């Protein structure tokens, strides 16, 4: 029997009952070597017919092309997308004698019949669908060439025939979709997509690995000598915590080095009260390292597995309370501290990705006491000693405000003094705190009131000596001497025998003395009396408190 006629007869029958077409061809070959010749031929050297018509013999259904073993694709399974690699299916070109056939298809038992020692991602065969079957229309037509005539059929016929099959119309969840060779770029594009997918899988891990449970605030970033990547500096946001963290991040998002300085003296914050850094970190990572598989509008199985939130159309947005380690969080956030007008301790942190306002813990304040007085000087004497440590102009008052601190050791009292904006003569003094010590006994350096050193009392004894002498005896002796001196002045006559009235021709120095608690204090005062009549009552009563007893002194015969 002619081998070529035998091949045509076998192909016209049921292809599913004939077994392996390759084995039949080897058993029917003329010289026994034709069956192995196609294995040595390059796919580019296979003859391809350019015929545009197709002839299907009677008794052959178009759906049998999909079920025939001829359409088995030599898919070499490789590690699944979970390990960072993709499938690389390669179609097998089979030629029989003078005929050649190039096709692509899937069988239900394709993956179950494959034997591999590597890890494979195999979805259930019953739920597997022929992905992207509609793309066959855009591919070159599949040709079949016989002995005496050539016949070809376009992919549209197979697609239309496959559309009537109930097996192909079965809905399948997207997560079980298997990528085909048309979904994966060829050549360098395929390698690029594999490498980018691996970067995406690694890019999502740094924020998780660097999460230590604390809240961090970024305060700087710079390039350090000897480091390949920039170094970011973070500080713990807990009040009075001095722990700092610095780490270096590579260009692909990998955290290469993390250094902690100090030890936390507080427990980790609750998850509900942590800063929202995870969302900012994810947004920054997506902006800096976009996934190349995201450019495929139709999507593939690998993209759906690595990015499940993009497949469903509902982007996964972390809650506001969710947090990252703060290192990744603060890379795109800039915390802005806004001090209050009169409250230097209260600060608000405004996050770009969240509207959470976290007030810092304020120290306990002492009560304030405000005193307003009218004075020409700014500082009033309150008995305490103060040291000035600052001055500034506050908003709403053009007059400067001076800040003082009590000089006593350990005293927390402070005050600030300023003149009122509505009244320049009014001095406003604000005290903060309470003194924990007594008022100093010595005179304050800020005392501007001049007190008299000596205040004579009306009951004190005063001796008017009139320049003759100073008495240090008791009050009786001083009084007797005073009367004696007055008597001498009255009886005094002029050398020429002319009587005179009690007149002081020249200023005289008078001394006064007072006996106070056994101590004699002396003073000197210059007095002038140029009147003709000597009136003793004109003397200063403060230095001579006794009432005059001689009246007007006159001299005469």
UniProtKB/Swiss-Prot annotation:
Gene Ontology molecular function terms on file: DNA-binding transcription factor activity; metal ion binding; transcription cis-regulatory region binding
UniProt family annotation: Belongs to the WRKY group I family.
Residues spanning the membrane: none
Protein known as: Probable WRKY transcription factor 20
Ranges where the record places region Disordered: 1-36, 76-215, 257-348, 433-486, 520-557
The organism's place on the tree of life at top rank: Eukaryota
Role: Transcription factor. Interacts specifically with the W box (5'-(T)TGAC[CT]-3'), a frequently occurring elicitor-responsive cis-acting element.
Biased composition (Polar residues): 95-114, 193-207, 303-314, 520-536
Keyword Zinc: yes
GO cellular component, one term: nucleus
Pfam families: WRKY (PF03106)
Positions that bind Zn(2+): 236, 241, 264, 266, 406, 411, 435, 437
Keywords linked to the UniProt accession: DNA-binding, Metal-binding, Nucleus, Repeat, Transcription, Transcription regulation, Zinc
Compartments where found: Nucleus
Keyword Magnesium assigned: no
GO biological process: positive regulation of DNA-templated transcription; response to 1-aminocyclopropane-1-carboxylic acid; response to wounding
DNA-binding region coordinates: 205-269, 375-440
Record's compositionally biased regions (Low complexity): 151-169, 321-332
Compositional bias ranges of the Basic and acidic residues kind: 1-12, 282-299
